[in-house]
Amino acid sequence: MLFTKISSIPVNQHFQDMPRRKDSRSSTRHAPEFSGVIRPNGRIWVSAEQFYRAAEQIWTTEGVDLNAFVFPLIVNYALCAELSLKAAEGGAVGGGLTPDGLVKAAKIMSTAHGHNLSDVFASLELPTQSAIESEFLAASGEQLAPLLAECSDYFIQARYAYEQIGGSYNLSGIRTLAKGLLDAVKALSTRNP
């Protein structure tokens, strides 16, 4: 059904120029060795969609005071955006066949890591970035870059909001970003077999 077509992009090509993490863990995290090809991953995308639907349940329920749910809304929309970006370049570690012909266990992963949306986006291959920007504009009517910059740290800030002193969030912006990325990555997989 969703994301079932296979592309011919070589697996190791995606890791040659991938930016390294900027935090203290950069020396301990290495790119996993993916089996098969890197392409939009339906399993990661479905997780993103679930976080979007959870936020929409709050947003669209009549009589709900959105101010009472600011942080759950932001966290769910921001995690949807993060997972949508990560779904754009997913793959499996492990897998293959045993000598008996049985399928080995595989772990679904993304080429991208972290929670900062700008960093996650920047770690994607340039053709993937361009396709997402184009599909995002088509899906939402908005440019991706300004929303990505504005909402880049929303998940990090809102999940432990009690650690923050003040701050403000653009609820409509993060909602547009989440829905636009969800739609863009889905379109990316169906239009680029």
Predicted segments, located by residue:
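A structural signal for alpha-helical segments
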Residues: R43, A68-V75, Y169
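Short regulatory "switch" loops immediately downstream of catalytic or recognition motifs
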Residues: I58-T61, G90-G96
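Helix-loop segments that flank and shape redox-cofactor active sites
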Residues: E56-F69
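Short, hydrophobic, well-ordered secondary-structure elements
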Residues: E49, V70-A92
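Long, charged low-complexity segments
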Residues: F3-Y52, E56, G95-P193
